[in-house]
Amino acid sequence: MFSILNKLGIIWLALANISNCDNSKSGHKSIPKYNVKYYHANIPKDFANRFVELNDKIVENGSFEILGIDGQPSKNQYLCFTPNPNTAVNVSIESAQRNTRSKEIENEPKSEAEIIQRGVEMIEKSFSRKDCVFAYGSNGGYWTLGYCYGDKVVQFHENLQHFVATGKHKPEYPDYIYVLGRFKGSSKKPTNLDNQSPWASNNLDLSEFTIHESSIISDATAKNEQSRFLQHTLYDGEICDLTRKPRSIDIIYKCDPNHRGRIEILDQQEIKTCVYQMVIGVPKLCSLDEFRPNKVEDQIIDIDCKLIDQTNKVKADKLSYQDFFYYTDDIPSDNKIFPIPHSYKVSLNNYNLSPCGHGFYLGQSKLPINSPSVYFNFRHILVFNDQYHSSSDLLEKLGKMLKVCVGNKILSPHIENKRQSLLSWNDTFILWFELYDFYGSFISLVKVSRDGSKEELELKLRLINPETMLDQDGDLVKVPEFDAPNNAWNFQKFSKGKGSALDSTNNDKNNKATAENDKQYQSTSTDIVTVTVTESLETTSSEDGTEEVSNEMVILKKLADKLGMTDINELHQAIEDLDIELEVQHDEL
């Protein structure tokens, strides 16, 4: 079998790229899909070679192959066993839900108009004409989106400091709230962030809705899902500077199986100039069989790949192919400097991945982990699906991602009303993540520190080698002792509000014994990369003492919006490089 592994291109998470067709509809047998599992098993090199020599004798069972998973033969090599798909055990996706739903639909046939009516009724019951639903951090944190039922859809630049302090949304520039589309009969009052709907009821016009179906791959588990959604197009938005036509937006209402009991804006994109699409998860739609994802049964074949220990010189005696399966993970171990070694590799299809922006995903294990390391059993990981050219480049990308996720995506260890609260800029914390690429290969440890007592929205970031505990500058970092409040094992320290958890160890009498050891790190640790995530504009003081945005920065803001640039400073630098002088006239405003 040269080999299914090579045919897959060694892109293990790309199960989504392996056929996502619903073959059951055409009457054909489902195409096998491959679920690659990694084990840090340390098989001796000679044993690995002997397993490969067994291939001619085990054709009915499958085949072994030695592969440099990352495309670098000299780097980490794995011994992989690919079962013969004709004799492999059929590990199928449970399809009882699909069969039950299919029978219900067969017994109760419904027209498209009936399905639309039922779906729209759920939408009408879900929304309030008094409130708006917001999503902070769209387009890399540049826009905040607002969906106001019965009124409008808007995007605006968030006043981040106000949001952090109050939890309420406020535009940085009140005159620049862009309306992407309006409901029919909506208010023509000057636009603000309130729901200004004049409607007397929640009733929608059924003729404005269309129903669609889409095939998607759920997570990385090779589940084909046929999903229905309702589309509603809103017109009459702000005039677009480029097309000179009103903006419009397609609203996609769907059942999100991973919903958290509340309506959420799941996605928004500009599909062409000044024409947008917004996807909204409506939990009540999940109560209708017609809108729940239709899971299709597939044949899943596991491919086991186990790390080869190139330094182990033990010679193999007599082997059978079954011996391969007795080699399991021999790490993590608390006996190491850090529980995770630099050579570690994860099977990303074992993780639920939640997008964080800028190519980063937050990963949580789907199944319980039972290892000697309690840290390893409960921690979350970061996954990066992009390229970087240097450690400073990677740190910059991390900073941009965290700017969006702190206060919006990452949960803190604090429990409030039986629910975990979001990590806030007012919190003080030391947070650790293992960072992996989209092959599942380890990149670096990431240490994130925040002092919530500071007004500046700053984070201190370090990239650390877990085997040497040296950071990107070669400075030694102390091996952490995790407080892990409420079993949140990514948190070394945490203090809710504007405390100073970073210095809390000074008051811990149990740490007196380690005081001498701490000194060695003080002498070797120097500069730490600091990422400032505020993007303040130049201001001038008016006669009454209030601050106003300078005319120059307003012009830059307008230019950046028209050019589609997300960083005003980048535009400013480009102008300086071209030796162009900005002349601001009052009548230009």
Swiss-Prot record:
Residues 1-21 form the signal peptide. Disulfide bonds join 132-148, 240-274, 255-286. Residues 509-519 have a biased composition (Basic and acidic residues). One of its GO terms (biological process) is endoplasmic reticulum unfolded protein response. Glycans are attached at residues 17, 61, 90, 426. GO terms for molecular function: carbohydrate binding. Its main location: endoplasmic reticulum. InterPro entries: Man6P_isomerase_rcpt-bd_dom_sf (IPR009011), MRH_dom (IPR044865), OS-9-like (IPR045149), OS9-like_dom (IPR012913). It is found in: Endoplasmic reticulum membrane. The keyword Disulfide bond applies. A motif (Prevents secretion from ER) lies at residues 586-589. Residues 497-520 are annotated as: Disordered. Keywords: Disulfide bond, Endoplasmic reticulum, Glycoprotein, Lectin, Membrane, Signal. A mannooligosaccharide derivative binds at residues 143, 155, 241, 247, 270, 276. One of its GO terms (cellular component) is endoplasmic reticulum membrane. It comes from the Eukaryota. The keyword Membrane applies. Residues 130-288 form the MRH domain. It is a peripheral membrane protein. Interacts with missfolded ER lumenal proteins. Lectin involved in the quality control of the secretory pathway. As a member of the endoplasmic reticulum-associated degradation lumenal (ERAD-L) surveillance system, targets misfolded endoplasmic reticulum lumenal glycoproteins for degradation. This is Protein OS-9 homolog.
